[in-house]
């Protein structure tokens, strides 16, 4: 194939134009999806129309250019009119050109703005009379710029009504800004309808004024309907965006990952929302310290995040950011405000504690404990007095016996090593410990790598020797010795030793406790010497060890105490012994009896026992037989022909080792049914009384005689003390129921005659009624009755009372003589009779019935009875304590 060569200049120019055209068309890409917006007929300036998805068309567009200058498109695809646009047609279209300079790609997005008019439905035509409806005057959209510079009054628009064609119309307005607050900001010319504003307006104070226009004739007729006339204030970017806080304070963990949210800043703008005046962009203006840059802020949301993982609190613990916010979507002509943001880096446990040395050495004396022996310092760069800084020490090796304990000093954060159990120089002269340290909070690198890391150090503890005195080990030692060993024999004693020399040289021994004082101890050797006979059977309990407490003392006076347990081996030093001494056998009911024996020795020297009759006399062997029952008992039987009496039966018992003893049993062969019925006289016949028993018997007999003598004397004294019979009246009442003075109570001077035949006689001779005494008798005559009382016999102390009514009574010893009785009663009876005779005419007798019918003034005597006061006599108190023999008479008189 032959390629023609274009050599002419015309051909070359044509080829150049063709290549240029192809190059231009290479930048023109295919059109993206068409976007349609339904909008009103009038579009306000800077009011969003809609949003176009730019990334769906070209994801990496760095150039955005609308084909129509009346519109602008932001980075997020928002479409705004740059001025007020009125759609004359139903549609208006333009394109958004997107370009990517790196990829050398260009695409277009068709945008269509549609305005749909309302279509009225067709109505069926009817044959009606056509009327012309009154057309309403329509307002023209009106607005004014915020903070307008005038000149004022500023013309806004002209309002005209169709009624002006037929009438002379006058215009007026009302509403806020005209005749309402704020007043007179707007007015309208009455004749022309021109609307004016008188002053600048702040949109943030008043964003719209809703006025109402009126058209009326001169006579006040409303030529047209009132017209709403809104006046919108167009926003001006006159307000700076402001942060909500002057200083923000945030915290972020140390070593945070990329993209960790630190906090959010926020700003507000008072300008009209959803306009460029309030589209804010955030940015970081300055960071202190300046490098490296660790933070970024989202331009639209204000969210601050980390952009680096290198954030170390130990290097920088606090950052200061100067935040900037700018309206007009961050364009260079937007208004700017700033704020301060303080970011504090929170501490994380990213620094492990470390020992300052790898090895440590210390020393401690043996046998000391609860003492501090070493302080181990550590370094930690984390924040002081936090869980990331506080150290936690652990003994990893060398403390298997629990000798040591390590704690943390909360002030210095040092490890404090202490000895809690005493160390023994002889056993461990040196101890090596491995100490580990970490923090209370987990190490973040351990968590991330899941590999525990712990700093470690070695500690060598040297144990110092100390004279700790002798040691009694074991605390109990045992020794065996035979019972009844010879006094003065020696046995091994308690052995203590010096832990340093491992022997007992230089130690002295001392006995502290020996319950029976059986042994003595040698001071130097510690050997025990038997000082008394050892008797195992007196120990309680017998099979227990005999414990001796011993003290070992070294040359410096230090001591220890141990126990020597002596096991006393039993020997057959005790013969078996029969328990019974006296036995009762009831014949013929009981044909035998059992006897038993005991041996205090060990069982090896004890049963089985052998029982035998020790007496070889034919009489004993003929009557008694002895048969073995078991190891410790035998049965003693008798012949039926044996007589009932007490027998002395000798029985020999022998243990298994041949040790034997003989005992004579007193066997009472008795004719009874039960042993308790057998008399004990035979049993006690052989009993002899001691001197103390005889003395006790004599004292008992003397005491018995003294008691009997006291009783006899008491009976005699009681009989002598009885004076009168208990009842001289023989329980007979004297009849004295007359209205006149009784003959048994009233004494008369004429009727009371006393004749004394013998005044020298002893005793008390009493009368009841009248009586007489002749030849040693005493006669007493009274008004009524006759009684004779024999003379009181002094020698026999026996008195006889013969009653006039036939009564008879004997009395015992008299208390008074007759002269004493006569001298006592005679003056008083005479005085009584004399007083009665003197007052007989003046004082009525109290034994007669008297009438008291005078109701006048009171009686001078003060009583309706007899003169009781005059009847009272001195010296008659003895009548208040009568003897029992007079009580019956006194009670009878009192009842009356």
Curated annotation (Swiss-Prot):
Membrane topology (Extracellular): 136-695
Knocked-out gene: effects: Knockout is embryonically lethal. Embryos die before compaction is completed at 2.5 dpc. Oocytes and sperm are fully capable of zygote formation. In stratified epithelia conditional knockout mice, 10% of mice develop severe external epidermal blistering which is exacerbated by mild mechanical stress within hours of birth. Affected mice die within a few hours of birth. Intra-epidermal blisters show acantholysis just above the basal cell layer, later stages of acantholysis show lateral separation of basal keratinocytes and at the bottom and roof of the blister half-desmosomes are present.
Major location (coarse): membrane
InterPro entries referenced in this protein's UniProt entry, alphabetically: Cadherin-domain_protein, Cadherin-like_dom, Cadherin-like_sf, Cadherin_CS, Cadherin_pro_dom, Cadherin_Y-type_LIR, Catenin-bd_sf, Desmosomal_cadherin
Matching PROSITE patterns: CADHERIN_1, CADHERIN_2
Membrane topology label: Single-pass type I membrane protein
Entry keyword set: Calcium, Cell adhesion, Cell junction, Cell membrane, Cleavage on pair of basic residues, Cytoplasm, Glycoprotein, Membrane, Metal-binding, Repeat, Signal, Transmembrane, Transmembrane helix
Subcellular localization: Cell membrane; Cell junction, Desmosome; Cytoplasm
Any one cellular-component term (Gene Ontology): plasma membrane
GO biological process: homophilic cell adhesion via plasma membrane adhesion molecules; in utero embryonic development
Gene Ontology terms for molecular function: calcium ion binding
Transmembrane stretches, start-end: 696-716
Signal peptide: 1-31
Cytoplasmic-side segments: 717-896
Every Cadherin domain range: 136-243, 244-355, 356-472, 473-580, 581-691
Propeptide: 32-135
Disulfide links within the chain: none
Domain of life according to the entry: Eukaryota
Tissue-specific expression: Expressed in the basal layers of epidermal stratified epithelia from birth (at protein level).
Glycosylation sites: 166, 392, 547, 630
Quaternary context: May form homodimers. Interacts with DSG1; there is evidence to suggest that the interaction promotes cell-cell adhesion of keratinocytes.
Entry text on domains: Calcium may be bound by the cadherin-like repeats.
General function of this protein: A component of desmosome cell-cell junctions which are required for positive regulation of cellular adhesion. Required for cell-cell adhesion in the epidermis, as a result required for the maintenance of the dermal cohesion and the dermal barrier function. Required for cell-cell adhesion of epithelial cell layers surrounding the telogen hair club, as a result plays an important role in telogen hair shaft anchorage. Essential for successful completion of embryo compaction and development beyond the 8-cell stage.
UniProt protein name: Desmocollin-3
Organism name: Mus musculus (Mouse)
